[in-house]
Structures are given as C-alpha cells and as structure tokens.
Amino acid sequence: MIKNITGIAMSGGVDSTATAILQKQKGPVLGFFMKLNQPDYETQRDRVSQIAQKLDIKLEIIDLTEEFQEYVLKYFSASYFKGLTPNPCIICNKEIKFGLFQQAILRQGVERIATGHYAQIHKTAAGYQLHKGVDPHKDQSYFLSRLSQEQLAHSIFPLGGMHKGAIYDLVEAHGFHDFRGTESQDVCFLEQDNVVDFLEQTAEFSASSGNIVMNDGKILGKHKGLHRYTVGQRRGLGISYPVPLYVINLDVKNNNVIVGENEQLFHKTMAISDIHWISQPEREDLLHASVHIRSTHKGAQASVILKENNRASVIFDEPQRAITPGQFATIYKDTQVLGSGVIL
C-alpha cells in the first residue's frame, strides 16, 4: 500500500468536488467514480471527468452495475413486496459505497478514501466512533449507521466539520460557479424518485390490487398495490371519509391497506432486529439513548431493552408518529452513532 495517497469518491456534485479540493491541498489524490444504474450515467460521468480534469486529478471508473443490482435493487423490490418501506441508501452505503467500491479503491494502492458525507469520525483507544456532522441541516450520520470499524478506518469525511455555505464558498473560490443553489444528489437508480414506476417494471407488482379498510374491517375503497403506500401516508388514498385518514398499517397476508385517524399513528413502543453496533453500548441489557426512526426524524429519547439474536424493544418517553416497518432505527448517544436496527 502506498502511503499518503487518498482516494476521492467523485459524483459530480458540490460536496464531492469540495472534498477533492480539500484533500488535494493535503497531498496526492486519485479520483474514483462509480458506474451503477444511474438514469443519467453518461451526463454524470462527463461532469465528473470535467471536474477531475480541472482539478488535475486522475480519474478511474469502477463498474459496480451487477453488484448494485444484487445488493440494492433486489433488497429494494423485495422490501416493498413484503409490505415494508426500505432505505436503499443505508444498504448502498454498507454494501456498495463503503463496501465493494471502497475495496476496489484500496486495491489500487490507496490508503484511505474521502467522501463528501456530512459526518465525523473520531479515533479512540477503543476504535472508531461515528458522529453527526456539525451542520444539523445536512448531517448524514443516519445513512452511515451500518458501517463497520474496518470501513470507518479507511474513510475520511472532510466536510463533517463544515457548514453548507462554506462548501459553496470553497468551490467558487476554485472556479466552480455553477453549484450555488444546487444540492448534491446520491447516485440513484430512480429517475425523479418514481418508486412506483420502478417497482411495476417487475412482475410481482403487476396484479396486486386489494381493499382499503378500517381497523374494524369496514371496506372504504380499493388500492392498486401495497407498494404504492407507506405508514403515515394521507395523499393518494382515493377515499372519502368525514375526517382525514392515514395509512396505519399494511396487511400483506390479506393484501389490505389499513387506514385510521391521525392519533392511531402514535406509538410508544417498537421492536427492532438485525442490530448492528458501530460502538458497543456500556451495558448488555439496557441503554437510554436518542433513537431516530427515519432520516428526517429529529430523534426521541427512549429506553432500548437489548435481547438475544440482535433484537431489542424500544420504549419511547413520548409516543412517536408513523413508526414504519422496514425503516432503520438509529441509536445515538449525544452526537455519536452507536448502531442501528431494522424496525419490525
């Protein structure tokens, strides 16, 4: 392994461009770009190539199309087929960006890889800790909650201690004036976030209509497939009722969308499975922590009762709205990510 060479994960966005600028100031770098299932792959590739050329960075393209299909797309479709709401970004980070992509870069003789994520890594005597980025509006630590110690050991997050405004100032100072007002987007297989169109390209979702029902079994209407709905959804139900109704559950066994009033979305308890710890908690039976039930959730204080087989029961201090099976619950101690589990 060649010392002091940093790999840069480049996507063509403002964050990866700022990362490249910062790391190049510190020493030699190599740029890397992932080919996945991007709808606009050629446009994105050309954009990355232009940025790399302007910064005088050698760029290599790593094709992970088949692997992305296997690890991310299959998980995404299978989750909806089971009536779950997946988070493909978390799986992509674990298996692709910080998994196969990172491994491919390390084989090039690179020691560490810098990405444009808004998070921080702290090295301690006990290992590597993952912390929130200092910009609360851009923090991405939730999406990194499945990373391993080894993955963190080879990662650098130069933007974790910065705010977004400073990022724009930095790239503009280096001649990039077309980023202001734009946001970096994760490399994604969904064009314009059209989940339904993507899912209905697969046979499983071709003939899956069923009933929209109340908890007591009263039928209010028909749905066009469970994959079109998620817990907490109000729009697009196509039903009439004296008060607003929301999706409160997806009954896969009977192919029903169960709806109810807003207060029925609030719960104090949930179960999580497949817990992955970045940093082991001090106790093996119980911990008090802030738990985030989705990426946009601000977090809520809870008691996490640890059980066998990487499972836990979570009891919130206050009821939480729209706890959604399939999403990840990320466990924080102050700014530190301890780990995460899948909501059952």
Curated annotation (Swiss-Prot):
Its EC number is 2.8.1.13. Pfam families: tRNA_Me_trans, tRNA_Me_trans_C, tRNA_Me_trans_M. Residues 138-140 are annotated as: Interaction with tRNA. It is found in: Cytoplasm. The record marks H117, Q327 as: Interaction with tRNA. ATP binds at A9, M10, S11, G12, G13, V14, D15, S16, M34, G116. GO terms for molecular function: ATP binding; tRNA binding; tRNA-uridine 2-sulfurtransferase activity. One of its GO terms (biological process) is tRNA wobble position uridine thiolation. Disulfide bonds join C92-C188. The keyword Cytoplasm applies. Keywords: ATP-binding, Cytoplasm, Disulfide bond, Nucleotide-binding, RNA-binding, Transferase, tRNA processing, tRNA-binding. It catalyses: S-sulfanyl-L-cysteinyl-[protein] + uridine(34) in tRNA + AH2 + ATP = 2-thiouridine(34) in tRNA + L-cysteinyl-[protein] + A + AMP + diphosphate + H(+). InterPro entries: MnmA-like (IPR004506), MnmA-like_C (IPR046885), MnmA-like_central (IPR046884), MnmA-like_central_sf (IPR023382), Rossmann-like_a/b/a_fold (IPR014729). Belongs to the MnmA/TRMU family. Catalyzes the 2-thiolation of uridine at the wobble position (U34) of tRNA, leading to the formation of s(2)U34. This is tRNA-specific 2-thiouridylase MnmA. The lineage of its organism: Bacteria, Pseudomonadati, Thermodesulfobacteriota, Desulfobulbia, Desulfobulbales.
